[in-house]
Structures are given as structure tokens and as C-alpha cells.
Amino acid sequence: MSHLNNALVEFFVIIHKFISSIITNPNYSYGVAIIFVTLIIKLILLPLNIKSMRSTIRINEIQPEIQKIQKKYKNDPQRLQQEQMKLYKEYNINPFGSCLPLLLQWPILIALYYVFNNIQGISGVSFLWVKDLASPDIVLAVLAGATQYYSGLLMNPKGDNTQAKTASNMNLSMSIMMIFISSRLKAALVIYWVTGNLIQMGQTILTKKLEQKHSANKDA
């Protein structure tokens, strides 16, 4: 983990040096550097994120079939698992595919927490309405929760069934928790989180459109 921490510190320093050569005012250069770092990290994770989103979208689409299987084999767990895996294979779905990007993002987030705690230059630096990137900002915290909520909303299954309601409640709970956590973190880290959520929303909308086009071509 220390190698990742040190690598991200060096990476951020390089990006900030490049940005500050164009934008000399530190009240803009640090914030823009954080956004650039987020874009680069998201770009690196893009193939995994798209694959993950496709799996999630397809699983949501076949929920009626999954529920039929669950109802039919509710007293036979082994057969239930076999039939579900058969269905996933038929639709080319990896049920665990959505977990990998999330598992990769947490070490990065923890490493960035280390980065912003060890880069002294951000102390006292403002960005947009944020007075100090090294201090918490309540507006950013609310934005973190709101973007987290809408990002999750785009991926949640539609309908009034139990799974849709559970996913909706979990999304709301996580978003409220995000506001609480972000209100205690340095604004620099929360800018990364908000920017990442906005990018995620764009990726989800684009991937959904591509999946709809793929389904339409398949049915034609």
C-alpha cells in the first residue's frame, strides 16, 4: 500500500507541476490538478467500469427471469444456482464482474487520502467557493451525497419488486452516509469523489445507450 501511496504522491506532483505551468494561480491550479488526476484514474479504469456496468445492466434486464428461477427452485439451492449460472452464461454475464472496479477504487481512495494529507501545498488554498482545500466543506459534502445518489439511481433496477426497493433504500443510505463522511474529510479528497461520480454518471448513460442499441440489433 505504501508503494501506491508514494506513486500517487509523485503522480499528483507531476500533474500539478504541469497544470501550474499553465495556470499559475494556486487557487485554481490545485483544484484543476485534482480534476485532471480523477479523469486520468477514471480513464485507466474505463474498460473495467464499462464491463462492470454492462454486467449490472444485463442482470437488471433479466430480473424477471431470475425471479422465476428463484421461485421455481426455492427449495433446491443447488439447482437454483445451476440455473442462474446457466442464465448468466446465456446472456454473457459475469455476476461478479461489477465487484472488481469497486475493489480497485477503494485502495486508490485510501491512497489519495494519504496524498492530500501529505501534500502541504493545498493548505490555505481555495478553489471556486471552497475556502480551504485542506478543510471540510459542507456544500461539497452535499454534492458528494447527491452525485452518489444519482449515480446509483442510474444503475438501480426499475420496478416495485423487492430487489428494486432494497437497492433504492441502500442507495439512499449510502448517499446519506457519504454526506456525513465527506463533511469530515478534506475538500481536496471530496472534489475527487464528486468529479468521479459525475464521470461515472456520464459513463452509465453512455453504456446504457450502447446496451440498448446492442439489444435492438440483437432482436432485429
Swiss-Prot record:
Recorded topology in the membrane: Multi-pass membrane protein
Cellular compartment(s): Cell membrane
UniProt record, GO biological process: protein insertion into membrane; protein transport
Superkingdom of origin: Bacteria
Keywords associated with the record: Cell membrane, Chaperone, Membrane, Protein transport, Transmembrane, Transmembrane helix, Transport
Gene Ontology molecular function, alphabetical: membrane insertase activity
Transmembrane segment boundaries: 4-24, 30-50, 96-116, 172-194
Family annotation (InterPro entries): YidC/ALB3/OXA1/COX18, YidC/Oxa/ALB_C, YidC_ALB_C
Record's function text: Required for the insertion and/or proper folding and/or complex formation of integral membrane proteins into the membrane. Involved in integration of membrane proteins that insert both dependently and independently of the Sec translocase complex, as well as at least some lipoproteins. Aids folding of multispanning membrane proteins.
Protein name as annotated: Membrane protein insertase YidC
Native species: Clostridium tetani (strain Massachusetts / E88)
